[in-house]
Amino acid sequence: MEAARDAQHSDVLESKGCLASRTSSHQNRRASLSSDGTGLRVTDAPGLPRVMTPSDTASGLGQKTSSTSSSSSSSSSSSPSSSSSAQANRSLKVSLPEIQKEKYPEEFSLLKSQTTDGQRPEWTFYPRFSSNIHTYHVGKQCFFNGVFRGNRKSVAERTVDKSLGKKKYDIDPRNGIPKLTPGDNPYMFPEQSKEFFKAGATLPPVNFSLGPYEKKFDTFIPLEPLPQIPNLPFWEKEKANNLKNEIKEVEDLDNWQAPMPFLHGFLSTANRTITTCDQKV
């Protein structure tokens, strides 16, 4: 009986020791969780091989990322200008595409900064002070090889007035008025011509009046409406003109003289020629 009691007492003690070891292991696990806060971590016995858990892998990755971020921050703080210049170069490469010069050769030939002799710029630059945009002036220099070509008219020039009308006759833009001065053209600039002031005024003078204007003082105030000026039709005027011509022909008959006879005139002229020849001989 005593031996059976001792066996039961030893079994109870063993069970209590297992429970105590289990509670201590649970407390150790809770302490490790509260201290790390990353995940589950199991402490195995020294004799058994260690098994990696998800918490270990996450902590390793966190250490790697922290080290890389610290290195990148130090490198960025050491060279901010190089990174900004690289980004600017990339943006320029993306935003400014290359222009094919072979596709549009005539446009590139016009934008020459200098002439063939390389002495003066061919295009003028006028900045717009009213805005922030600086653009090139429309057109080239006014003088080409020392010659102003703004007041020269080309032979191949055709205006709208010339293209209208009949084929045989051209429409005269001046309506028959001759040129009085060399610069009498609206599309030319005579002030740029050489010695333009010696030719006189650029505009034609007013010459449609024969004499100077004389101012007349008209103080007549009619008390009743004046009679209208008679305006006869054309057939009445033509009939009156024919009547005047007939009256004049009849009046000229009073001064009529008979013509000289033909034979008498012929003989008289022949005698005159014979006498002149005899005198010469």
From Swiss-Prot:
Record's compositionally biased regions (Low complexity): 66-85
Entry keyword set: Phosphoprotein
Residues annotated with Phosphothreonine modification: 53
Keyword Phosphoprotein tagged: yes
Biased composition (Basic and acidic residues): 1-14
Pfam families referenced in this protein's UniProt entry, alphabetically: SASRP1
Tissues of expression: Detected in pachytene spermatocytes and round spermatids.
Post-translational modification Phosphoserine, affected residues: 71, 74, 77-79, 91
UniProt-annotated stretches for the region Disordered: 1-92
Composition-biased stretches (Polar residues): 21-37, 54-65
Name of the protein in question: Spermatogenesis-associated serine-rich protein 1
Gene: Spats1
